[in-house]
């Protein structure tokens, strides 16, 4: 009988000398002398080379035994005696296998346990959203810093050459022009063709000769140009960060990126903390993520709830007409929820679902905005359905928040009951008064007759 | 029904007999207004804690669009603080405290649920009752749509709780049957 033993470093095959007692196990010379040969050899070839016909193989896992029997025609056995035998082998493993000791076995076991745990939890180490969350925060910070610096450049250089702000509108081009030109007197002799168009360049040179503002000193000019270097450097960093974010989003959430773009997708993931948390939300929550303050204010004052949050900046919502933004935002949120779940739970890098959903939404957008006269009735029906759906969606959040208000209303109803009772008493009094007047009138008439 | 083409991620998958029972109960829940249709509304019922069990269709394409429901169903935890008083609760608290120190999960016959005791830093404690919502896959979304009285296929639905409902015993039996699939 042979015994197949599984270790974290590979497989081992032992021969049982005395099957009756199941003792005196002996090494068959199947040590793995080098890691290279061990790594290349698979279980199939290993068993085929070492098992003779008619041998019985003892295995620890009955399912593995069934597979071995099916593919290699080796009879396998699995029972309590085999388990006891394997336990004994495990306790003496370092002695039975020459060239192997506990210090070598520990890191291999640790690596195997990590791989097994990662497989069980279905965590892929390259799908980590922390970089995305930090990248989108850094992108926002760079935006603010860039705005501050460009405003400073315009203010400082405006003292010297105020017409330039009207001629060159773009901040980055403005910084490049200032850096190249320096003093405005130099504008007449310099060549701006690499930065500006011909008409703008001619206009710039004309304005530089007729400007009547103060002169700028060399020290101030040096400071302004250093500030321009800062602006251009930050703009370059921002461009690199955008490209990097695009690559990461296409890797982690390809369907969501195809639908709403990498910036909006990154903001959604950043808002929820991870793609895993984002996948657990219903699409009505995804539609108004980023507008929580407005939502709670609307619920408290019983006004209209918001139609979009972060999703407003998606390209599909931005290119829609104002009256259609709400409908497109709702459809986009529904498709985005499905795309997010595909990204979170699917293992592939396939973005087919996102691309198809985007095509459907674009077709719907064209259908909404390009209204034919013949389709007016259909549009009206669609609008009615959408209005009803919106009402249904708005009702559900209110029910959650209005439970306290309902209690207050119940208290108010109990307070109103005495008012009703007092009204009823008033009515009864009035009837009694009318009856009394009738009686008095009757007696008066009788007295006149008498 | 072709069993070979079923996605292996659709687990636990009901066999034909249990599927008929599930769809029949789903239809009755529709009549009693105890059903929420669609993956979105099922998500909301799980978040609000009013779901008895979740039924999902195994032939959804792609199946990932409803794999968040098992996560939410297994993640449902009800927490509350227990106030110490000289009564039956006091004895229960002492027992729970002993169980907490030994590190075991206490299963109390009174509550019939798994209870864990967390000793907080301010000498009070928090009791967590872990109550998973059962979920099950049925082979066909068309059949699930018909059971929900909807002309279109339905990929997920949730039977909600109602203490006064006549379906209470049937729901309990079906929940037990669903949990047997996981053994």
Swiss-Prot record, chain A:
Ranges of compositional bias, category Basic and acidic residues: 399-423
Any one of the GO BP annotations: ribosome biogenesis
GO-annotated molecular function: snoRNA binding
GO cellular component, one term: box C/D methylation guide snoRNP complex
Region (Disordered): 375-423
Segments forming domain Nop: 252-370
Domain of life according to the entry: Eukaryota
Compartments where found: Nucleus, Nucleolus
Residue runs in coiled coils: none
Keyword Nucleus applies: yes
Keyword Nucleus recorded: yes
Family, per entry: Belongs to the NOP5/NOP56 family.
PANTHER family tied to this protein: NUCLEOLAR PROTEIN 5 NUCLEOLAR PROTEIN NOP5 NOP58, NUCLEOLAR PROTEIN 58
Function: Required for 60S ribosomal subunit biogenesis.
Protein known as: Putative nucleolar protein 5-3
Gene name tied to this protein: NOP5-3
């Amino acid at each position: 009988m042979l015994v197949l033993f599984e270790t974290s470093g590979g497989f081992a095959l032992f021969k049982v000398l005395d099957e009756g007692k199941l003792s005196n196990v002996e090494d068959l010379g199947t040590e793995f002398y080098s890691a290279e040969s061990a790594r290349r050899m698979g279980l199939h070839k290993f068993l085929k080379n070492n098992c003779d016909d008619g041998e019985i193989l003892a295995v620890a896992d009955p399912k593995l035994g069934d597979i071995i029997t099916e593919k290699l025609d080796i009879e396998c056995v699995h029972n309590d005696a085999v388990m006891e035998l394997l336990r004994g082998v495990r306790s003496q493993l370092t002695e039975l296998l020459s060239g192997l000791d506990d210090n070598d076995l520990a890191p291999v076991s640790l690596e195997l346990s990590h791989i097994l745990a990662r497989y069980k939890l279905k965590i892929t180490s390259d799908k980590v959203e922390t970089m995305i969350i930090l990248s989108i925060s850094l992108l926002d910070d760079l935006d603010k810093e860039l705005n501050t610096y460009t405003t400073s450049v315009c203010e400082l250089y405006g003292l010297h050459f105020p017409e330039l702000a009207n001629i060159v509108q773009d901040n980055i081009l403005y910084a490049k022009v200032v850096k190249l030109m320096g003093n405005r007197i130099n504008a007449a002799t310099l060549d701006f063709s690499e930065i500006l168009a011909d008409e703008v360049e001619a206009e710039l040179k004309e304005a530089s000769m007729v400007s009547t503002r103060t002169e700028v000193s060399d020290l101030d000019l040096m400071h302004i140009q250093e500030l321009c270097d800062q602006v251009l450097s930050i703009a370059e960093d921002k461009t690199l960060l955008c490209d990097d974010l695009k690559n990461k989003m296409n890797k982690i959430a390809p369907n969501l990126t195809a639908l709403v773009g990498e910036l909006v997708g990154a903001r959604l993931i950043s808002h929820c903390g991870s793609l895993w948390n984002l996948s657990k939300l219903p699409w009505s929550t995804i539609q108004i993520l980023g507008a929580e303050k407005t939502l709670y204010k609307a619920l408290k004052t019983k006004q209209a709830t918001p139609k979009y949050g972060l999703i407003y900046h998606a390209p599909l919502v931005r290119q829609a007409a104002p009256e259609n933004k709400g409908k497109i935002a709702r459809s986009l949120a529904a498709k985005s929820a499905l795309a997010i779940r595909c990204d979170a739970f699917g293992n592939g890098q396939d973005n087919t679902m996102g691309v198809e959903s985007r095509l459907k939404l674009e077709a719907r957008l064209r259908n909404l905005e390009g209204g034919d006269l013949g389709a007016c009735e259909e549009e009206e029906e669609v609008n009615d359905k959408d209005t009803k759906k919106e009402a249904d969606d708005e009702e559900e959040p209110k029910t959650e928040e209005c439970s306290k208000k309902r209690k207050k209303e119940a208290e108010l109803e109990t307070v109103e009951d005495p008012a009703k009772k007092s009204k009823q008493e008033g009515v009864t009094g009035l009837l009694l008064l009318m009856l009394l007047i009738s009686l008095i009138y009757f007696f008066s008439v009788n007295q006149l007759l008498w | 029904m072709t069993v070979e083409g079923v996605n292996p991620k659709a687990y636990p998958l009901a066999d034909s007999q249990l599927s008929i029972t599930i769809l029949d109960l789903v239809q009755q829940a529709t009549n009693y207004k105890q059903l929420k249709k669609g993956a979105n509304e099922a998500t909301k019922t799980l978040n609000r804690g009013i779901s008895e069990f979740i039924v999902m269709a195994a032939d959804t394409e792609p199946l990932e669009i409803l794999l968040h429901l098992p996560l939410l169903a297994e993640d449902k935890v009800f927490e509350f603080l227990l106030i110490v008083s000289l009564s039956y609760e006091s004895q229960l608290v002492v027992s729970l405290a002993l169980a907490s120190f030994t590190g075991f999960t206490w299963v109390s016959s009174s509550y019939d649920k798994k209870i864990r005791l967390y000793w907080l830093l301010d000498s009070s404690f928090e009791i967590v009752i872990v109550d998973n919502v059962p979920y099950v896959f049925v082979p066909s979304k068309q059949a699930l749509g018909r059971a929900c009285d909807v002309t279109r296929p339905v990929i997920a639905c949730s039977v909600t709780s109602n203490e006064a409902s006549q379906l209470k015993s049937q729901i309990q039996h079906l929940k037990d049957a669903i949990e047997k699939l996981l053994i």
